[in-house]
């Protein structure tokens, strides 16, 4: 059997760059990170893996949960960036927080300050989900800031999802993010080169949703769940 380290589906492609860790005898079969810059499509990859049976922990979803009214983390963020971030009903004005943290002079320091408050709480909740995954299952951590947190070595495989910057900006515009804000958020995150340095599997996501779903299904079936990855 020949070895082919790339899977192509339309305009999407997955490349196996480094060996995948062996399956665990107890607990989840493998614990895998899915990461990528904002607008890359990493959440879509995670959704496909979940539909195939993976247990998932979503850092972005947890980040939203810990900033809901009544959560201690919300109070810490308000103390750090201004009590006016809280509406009369106690909820967070997320748009105001984003405008205050991202972009402009000193944004790196502000982003680091926000991350220092939220990331430890997100990590603790996520890993409680991953470690509780059923015996033999695939556990997936959807985490945007994997490079920035220097956590890649904790996973059996790291799946990086990438797309050209302008494609990502267009996707964010579709979510109501202004182009200049989208570019500021992208600049505040790790570069594609930094992500490639830690990738086990690299997914180029320039195609359709169907292309992406098919390439992720192949990655799941051929690389992430077998004892040893299979190649055609």
Regions found by a protein language model. Name each.
Residues 152-154, 170-232:
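Small-molecule kinase domains that catalyze NTP-dependent phosphoryl transfer to phosphate-bearing small molecules
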Residues 55, 61, 157, 200-201:
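Well-ordered beta-strand positions
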Residues 18-54, 59-61:
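Walker A (P-loop) phosphate-binding motif
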Residues 31, 54-56, 138, 152, ...:
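Hydrophobic "anchor" residues on beta-strands that sit immediately upstream
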Residues 31, 46, 59, 74-78, ...:
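A general structural signal for well-ordered alpha-helical segments in protein cores
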């Amino acid at each position: 059997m020949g070895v082919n380290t790339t899977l192509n589906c339309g305009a999407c492609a997955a490349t196996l760059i480094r060996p995948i860790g062996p399956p665990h005898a107890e607990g989840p079969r493998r614990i895998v990170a899915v990461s990528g810059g904002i607008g890359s499509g990493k959440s879509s990859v995670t959704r496909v893996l979940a539909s195939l049976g993976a247990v998932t922990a979503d850092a972005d979803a947890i980040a939203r949960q810990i900033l809901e009214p009544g959560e201690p983390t919300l109070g810490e963020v308000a103390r750090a960036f201004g009590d006016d971030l809280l509406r009369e009903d106690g909820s967070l004005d997320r748009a105001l927080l984003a405008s205050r943290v991202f972009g402009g002079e000193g944004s790196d320091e502000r982003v680091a300050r926000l991350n220092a408050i939220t990331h430890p709480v997100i990590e603790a909740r996520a890993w409680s989900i991953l470690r509780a995954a059923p015996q033999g299952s695939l556990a997936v951590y959807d985490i945007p800031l994997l490079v920035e947190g220097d956590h890649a070595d904790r996973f059996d495989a790291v799946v990086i999802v990438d797309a050209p910057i302008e494609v990502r900006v267009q996707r964010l515009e579709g979510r109501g993010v202004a182009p200049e804000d989208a570019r500021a958020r992208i600049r505040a995150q790790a570069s594609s080169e930094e992500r490639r340095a830690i990738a086990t599997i690299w997914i180029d996501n320039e195609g359709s949703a169907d292309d992406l779903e098919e390439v992720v299904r192949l990655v799941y079936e051929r690389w992430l769940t077998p004892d040893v990855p299979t190649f055609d």
